[in-house]
């Protein structure tokens, strides 16, 4: 049985570079402590729509108060992946959403998130082709190297589904 979750892909152009914002999970999280994940993720509560859930998770996890019209649907994906050290598997139906916030968004991470990291889109894409570390920047501009094994957001079907939408969203002439 699949449980329903939402994923927010926060796209940005920072100093002209197209990329994605990833959250670093808090070190006390039961799954993937200290790992890097999509900017906001979480379970969809009973009776809650996927869109309402992703807006709630963005507020709770990274302090962004987004409007529904700032979201682009990225589709839904069935995913199964190991639960890390706790064992077993997660079986999810993930509803993906994309948003574009240029520059450095006004993140205010909650207790589940340590901080935010910007990774160029081509660097993130390369993570699917090999195990090289990802070079990025923290919101304060300092350089950051994310070991490949610290990524917990690599879901092939979802990436294949949202990649072209991200490229369109990040095109220089796009404003959404």
Please state what every model-predicted region is.
Residues 65-75:
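A short coil-to-beta-strand element that immediately follows conserved catalytic motifs
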Residues 11-13, 100:
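A generic structural motif
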Residues 59-67, 102-103:
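Alpha-helix capping at helix-to-loop junctions
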Residues 1-9, 16-56, 60, 131:
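Conserved Nudix-box catalytic region and its N-terminal flanking loop in Nudix hydrolases
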């Amino acid at each position: 049985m699949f449980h329903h979750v939402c994923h927010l892909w926060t796209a940005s152009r920072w100093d002209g570079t197209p990329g994605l914002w990833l959250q670093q999970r808090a070190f006390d999280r039961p799954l993937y402590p200290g790992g890097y994940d999509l900017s906001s993720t979480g379970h969809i509560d009973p009776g809650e729509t996927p869109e309402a859930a992703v807006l709630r998770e963005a507020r709770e996890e990274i302090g962004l108060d987004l409007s529904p019209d700032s979201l682009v649907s990225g589709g839904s994906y069935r995913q199964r992946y190991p639960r890390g050290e706790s064992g077993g598997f997660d079986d999810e139906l993930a509803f993906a959403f994309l948003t574009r916030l240029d520059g450095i968004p006004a993140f205010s991470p909650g207790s589940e998130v340590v901080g935010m990291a910007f990774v160029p889109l081509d660097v993130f894409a390369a993570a699917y082709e090999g195990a090289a570390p990802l070079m990025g920047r923290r919101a304060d501009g300092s350089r950051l190297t994310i070991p490949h094994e610290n990524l917990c957001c690599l879901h092939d079907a979802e990436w294949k589904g949202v990649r072209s939408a991200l490229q369109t969203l990040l095109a220089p002439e796009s404003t959404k």
